[in-house]
């Protein structure tokens, strides 16, 4: 009689486990049937409308950053400025452009690039540099004078996660003066 009770409980437990597994299997199928579209690059298309550059850096052929201080990114004016030491070669560098979540960049960065055309020539004023690093004042002065941007400056388009919003950013390089 005792073995019959144990066998009955084992049968009940098997049925319960089977029901749980069936429920989980059905739930998994229901979730996997949702349509998650992908773009031509195989990236997930989301509902995110954010579309901006959050950081900008350049690396030399030794894979070391050539950035001096912090890059200045103005998401309203769609301008990214990176500062380098005087005389730093910028003709064979690898850009690293950080974007908001789910966004992508066009054109894609697939090779070393020449950023010489993005170099700005400008006159500096008191307060542009603090302890050898660029100040926000300098970035704001540059952004507020778009007529001074080189016509050959690098341009990249940021495309939002929903793939509907596109914003073109201008990437500029400013050399710190000799000190």
Residue ranges with predicted function:
Residues 33-179:
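Beta-rich interaction/scaffold domains
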């Amino acid at each position: 009689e005792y073995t019959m009770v144990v066998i009955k409980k084992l049968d009940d437990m098997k049925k319960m486990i089977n029901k749980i597994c069936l429920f989980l299997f059905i739930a998994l199928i229901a979730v996997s049937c949702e349509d998650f579209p992908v773009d031509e690059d195989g990236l997930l298309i989301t509902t995110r409308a954010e579309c901006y550059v959050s950081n900008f850096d350049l690396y030399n052929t030794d894979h070391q950053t050539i950035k001096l201080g912090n890059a200045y990114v103005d998401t309203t004016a769609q301008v990214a400025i990176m500062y380098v030491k005087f005389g730093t070669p910028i003709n064979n560098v690898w850009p690293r452009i950080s974007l908001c979540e789910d966004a992508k960049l066009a054109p894609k960065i697939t090779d070393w690039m020449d950023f010489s055309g993005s170099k700005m020539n400008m006159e500096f004023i008191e307060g542009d540099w603090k302890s050898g690093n660029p100040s926000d004042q300098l970035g704001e002065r540059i952004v507020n004078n778009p007529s001074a941007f080189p016509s050959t400056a690098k341009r990249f388009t940021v495309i939002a996660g929903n793939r509907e919003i596109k914003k073109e950013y201008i990437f500029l390089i400013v050399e710190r003066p000799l000190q």
